[in-house]
């Protein structure tokens, strides 16, 4: 029998913004504990929110083997590593004042705009241990400005958005960024009939395209890239990888199954060559395919392989 232990702690501050004013502050601290056990090709999982007795949780996970959920134990290389990337980003003790100051400047610099939605701070801690000797731990934090913007003269519910995720907050830069949006919005554009390049968020179309690289779709032949593993399937200027480098903000260097990406990058496509597929360890073993380090799991669930694009917990980078 093999065992894994996962502990997560997430703290957050969230200011609700309405009509360019601070409306409320929400503080949340959540801890979760997970035990997974593997025996004879089966998995048992038990999880709990808040403080818990790990021995009791382990016993519950062992009992849950009776659910007979097939899942092989695929050991990762034994690694002992700890990273603490926490920075002094903002004054969290005076988070309302930080938010009010930013909103006051935005209101002054962009008087025709109304701002709504959230200003947030996250601090996360993750620890993964298995009985093979691996011990991985990570601490990180980030500051998120996620504002919807309405011009006072329009009937629209929302005209623009401004989103910034950073661990190096610069209030002046945030104001300058929004001022650029303001100036552009208030500059009439003369657009004639014709074809134009359109700039869109990758999530609009890329996530659907990346579905072709799920292991189960590939194995069933339901993907446009059938039999493409280790072959050049796209332009050699294109690389797509899960980013665990120092550039990734508040992202643990390991996934929820304890795998660590070599040099911080787990390639889906490297210079046009299909190197791996989106799969958890179960799917990778079932279909005998290499996998992108991208497993994610709820505190009381079996690991899944998910596609994450520019989310706080994981990044898929297209270069």
Question: Language-model features: where?
Answer:
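Active-site bordering "gate/hinge" segments
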Residues: 1-252, 270-273, 307
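Dual-mode signal for accessory low-complexity, basic/Gly-rich regions
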Residues: 230-306, 310, 314, 319
């Amino acid at each position: 029998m093999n065992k894994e232990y996962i502990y997560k702690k997430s703290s957050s501050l969230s200011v609700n913004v309405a009509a360019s004013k601070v409306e409320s502050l929400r503080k949340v601290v959540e801890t979760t504990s997970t035990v997974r056990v593997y025996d004879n090709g089966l998995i048992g999982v038990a999880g709990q929110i808040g403080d818990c007795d790990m021995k009791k949780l382990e016993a519950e996970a062992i009992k849950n083997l009776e659910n007979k959920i097939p899942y092989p134990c695929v050991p990762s290389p034994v690694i002992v590593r700890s990273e603490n990337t926490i920075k002094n980003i903002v004054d969290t003790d005076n988070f309302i004042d930080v938010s009010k100051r930013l909103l006051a400047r935005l209101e002054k610099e962009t008087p025709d705009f109304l701002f709504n939605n959230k200003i947030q701070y996250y601090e996360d801690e993750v620890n993964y241990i298995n009985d093979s000797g691996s011990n991985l731990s990570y601490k990180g934090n980030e500051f998120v400005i996620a504002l919807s913007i309405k011009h006072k003269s329009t009937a629209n519910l929302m005209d623009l958005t401004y989103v910034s995720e950073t661990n190096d907050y610069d209030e002046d830069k945030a104001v300058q960024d929004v001022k650029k949006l303001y100036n552009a919005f208030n500059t009439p554009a003369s657009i004639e009939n014709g074809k134009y390049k359109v700039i869109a968020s990758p999530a609009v179309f890329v996530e659907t395209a990346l579905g072709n690289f799920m292991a189960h779709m590939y194995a069933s032949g339901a993907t446009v890239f059938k039999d493409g593993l280790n072959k050049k399937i796209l332009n050699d200027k294109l690389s797509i990888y899960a980013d665990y480098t120092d550039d990734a903000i508040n992202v643990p260097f390991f996934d929820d199954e304890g795998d660590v990406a070599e040099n911080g990058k787990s390639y889906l496509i490297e210079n046009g060559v299909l190197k791996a597929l989106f799969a958890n360890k179960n799917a990778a073993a079932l279909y005998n395919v290499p996998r992108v380090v991208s497993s994610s799991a709820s505190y009381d669930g079996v690991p899944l392989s998910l596609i994450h694009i520019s989310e706080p917990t994981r990044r898929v980078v297209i270069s």
